[in-house]
Amino acid sequence: MNHSEIVSFLWGVADLIRDTFKRGKYQDVILPLTVLRRLDCVLASTKAKVMETQARFKGKLDNLGGQLRKASGFAFYNTSRYDFDKLLADAPHLAANLRNYIAGFSPNMREVLEKFDFHNTISKLDEAGLLFQVLERFRNVDLHPDRVDNPTMGTIFEELIRKFNEALNENPGEHYTPRDVVHLMADLMLAGDENRIRRKGAVFSVYDPCCGSGGMLMITKEHVTAGVRRNGDILRPPINPGAEIHLFGQEVNPETWAVSKSDLFIKEPTGRDADNIAYGSTLSNDRHAGRAFDYLIANPPYGKDWKRDEEAVRAESERGAAGRFAPGLPRISDGQLLFFLHMLAHATDPKEGGSRIAIIMNGSPLFTGDAGSGESEIRRFILEHDLLEALIALPEQLFYNTGIATYVWVVTNRKVPARRGKVQLVDATSFWIPMRKSLGDKRREIPLERTQDILKILADFKDGDTRVITEDGKQEETVISKIFPTTHFGFRKITVERPLRLNFQATPERIKRLDDEKGFQSLAQSKKKGAAGAKEQAEGRVEQRRSGSFLERFPAGSSRTGTSSRTRSSPRPGKRSWPFPRRSRKRFFLRSPSGTKPPRSAATRKGIQNPIPSCETAKACRFPKACRTFSSAK
């Protein structure tokens, strides 16, 4: 079976448990049993040797762990006499035996399995009489590495997790990164470093602060040591098969952390990489504090707030340069830039080799935030320190549960001389092919050939580089690369003070419009109830009629002009990059007919209140409230 068939087979367990478990609880059954079945298949060939080793050294050694790990060939083992076949052979005692089987795993693997809280699920399945049927279904799928290799197994886990989230429509900001996008990001992060990586005895570290099921870390390592593979075929050779790559990560979701950790225990026999995957919130509890990494890669949650971490984040920000968030804090509704700053804080010092970073985010970090806001200050920090190497705009409809536009930021603190002080913008929105079958919202993918095109565009580093793009059946030569100095993206917010013309004329046309003005309508409204409210409304209607009569007697053709000031943001001429909305012009009651330009007054100052136009008969006016209402600003 291919990975899609395996996912469909495992997801079919939902048909058995739908009357016992709510739709949102399917993962409590399917995910831990998928992990257990994978572990069962992995350990099958060395099961007898582990049991023999335990019998031989029991009572002779205080700590059997080393011998048992050696016997199993992995960093974990299971000393229980059960496997899936033997569990099903003793159906009456299945629940108790399954618990004993889980307890037989080594301590490091038990820690992983405990994150699933599976013991309660066992009890619920047993009480419903479903435990045997469910376990039998998992026994019928072969997940041995000889039949399902590690990359395929990773895809299966991600597909299952995607289905769980899709079924619930939960965690909308968390988007599991498709493999084609991960391959592109790994290539962008490693681009230009091939000679460095090929050095004999090369040792590098890779870090993902929101690693999910670990796909980005594992694919990056495969690019270096195993090459790019698909269906067993090598599409691109490895950069350096002998390089030593250490993986580090952190994940806040317990189930995906458990999946990542168990997968790495299988892929890396010493268990070193699995031990480096920490559990907890990266923003409030940095489990890798003090470490610096050579390569950093991430897909942080889009538009997800950081309220839960607010206290710790603000405390960290107050530490200034000693903390991770010194440049600024974004708005609390979106924490993408916090993960970005966290990655910058974990970059290796340029004097010690520096780092390269690839992070994919939506458009919010590019465009959100007014001048002086947290987002603007973070962007300013990145550009003034010349950290941004390139921005790549990706096609839409690449992700499983969103079709939004995304951008890959390529960042480094060791730019080559030709790139210093410059940023390359690449339009890769047309570099896609349609998928044969959609997966959720994912209808497009980036093939390896298009990935190579993007890498070549970056390597050529050519301003105005073009490609022939086919769109709607028409071919057109399009500019897909532009290069700008970092200063091009700067702007200043300035205050422009100038007269704001307010014209007062008592013409029949304007008097007729009074009934539509809220200020005039409010004269006959009251917040009081009963007789008191009715009295105020009646008095207001009298004022309205008298005001109308007064205006009709106003000398025809005469007018008065008042002035005010307004503030707007103005970028430096020719230096606009990210658009910041200008404040709209204030609208006034009894405004001038279109096209008229009353004389401009020089009486302006910042913050001046909108003046009330003078009136020759104002002193005799019995209704100053009415005049003030329809001659002041909204």
List PLM regions with ranges.
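Non-catalytic, mostly N-terminal accessory regions of nucleic-acid modification and defense proteins
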Residues: 1-194, 268, 272, 276-282, ...
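Hydrophobic alpha-helix feature that most strongly marks membrane-spanning transmembrane helices
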Residues: 225, 265, 269, 301, ...
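Short, contiguous acidic/charged loop-to-helix segments that flank catalytic cores in large enzymes
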Residues: 20, 307-316, 321-335, 364-374, ...
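Short acidic (Asp/Glu) and glycine-rich catalytic loops that position anionic groups and cofactors
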Residues: 135-136, 239-242, 273-278, 317-323, ...
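Conserved Class I SAM-dependent methyltransferase catalytic core
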Residues: 9, 16, 25-38, 254, ...
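C-terminal, active-site-flanking charged/polar segments
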Residues: 378, 383-388, 398-468, 511, ...
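Conserved S-adenosyl-L-methionine
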Residues: 175-298, 303-315, 323, 337, ...
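Hydrophobic alpha-helical scaffolding
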Residues: 124, 146, 210, 246-255, ...
